[in-house]
């Protein structure tokens, strides 16, 4: 791959809190196009906690993907469940990035976010996750001598 080739990203979207993540998905795709990247695959996960499994399968079977942006919204409830979900997903996503040698970026709102806060943050988190994925993929190619 030359430096002029497009970066190919995959987007993994949690279906839980879909009123928020649907907006995130749309904004992420728009921002990837703006950055000149190709969204080669959009995969859905039942919830944020499940995203590492989807990312693992995706990276194991789609070698053409340069990076993955993960989108989710973990809304605060009456217990600390939101903290467990967000922290465990984040930790495992980082592990997968290291394991596969490909960027996996975190566009997960929460823990501790209200529904209103999640709605307000949706576009920003989606854009930041995609931008990080594209930048990291480019830098990875530079470091590996592909550019």
From Swiss-Prot:
SUPFAM superfamilies per UniProt: Lumazine synthase (SSF52121)
Family annotation (InterPro entries):
LS, LS/RS, LS/RS_sf
List where the protein spans the membrane. none
Q: Does the keyword Zinc-finger apply?
A: no
Q: What class of enzyme is it?
A: transferase
Write the record's keywords in alphabetical order, separated by commas.
Answer: Riboflavin biosynthesis, Transferase
A single GO cellular-component term on record:
riboflavin synthase complex
Q: What is this protein called?
A: 6,7-dimethyl-8-ribityllumazine synthase
Q: What does this protein do?
A: Catalyzes the formation of 6,7-dimethyl-8-ribityllumazine by condensation of 5-amino-6-(D-ribitylamino)uracil with 3,4-dihydroxy-2-butanone 4-phosphate. This is the penultimate step in the biosynthesis of riboflavin.
Residues involved in (2S)-2-hydroxy-3-oxobutyl phosphate binding: 78-79, 121
Recorded superkingdom: Archaea
């Amino acid at each position: 791959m030359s430096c002029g080739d497009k970066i190919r990203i995959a987007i993994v979207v949690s279906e839980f809190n879909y009123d928020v993540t649907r907006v995130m998905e749309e904004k992420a795709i728009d921002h990837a196009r703006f950055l000149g990247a190709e969204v080669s695959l959009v995969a859905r996960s039942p919830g944020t906690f499940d995203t590492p499994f989807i990312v693992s399968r995706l990276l194991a079977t789609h070698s053409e993907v340069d990076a993955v942006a993960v989108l989710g919204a973990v809304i605060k409830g009456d217990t600390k469940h939101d903290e467990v979900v967000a922290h465990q997903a984040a930790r495992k996503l980082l592990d997968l990035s290291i394991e596969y040698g490909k960027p996996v970026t975190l566009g997960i709102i929460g823990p501790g976010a209200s529904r209103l806060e999640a709605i307000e943050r949706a576009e920003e988190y989606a854009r930041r996750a995609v931008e990080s994925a594209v930048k990291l993929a480019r830098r990875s190619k530079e470091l590996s001598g592909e550019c």
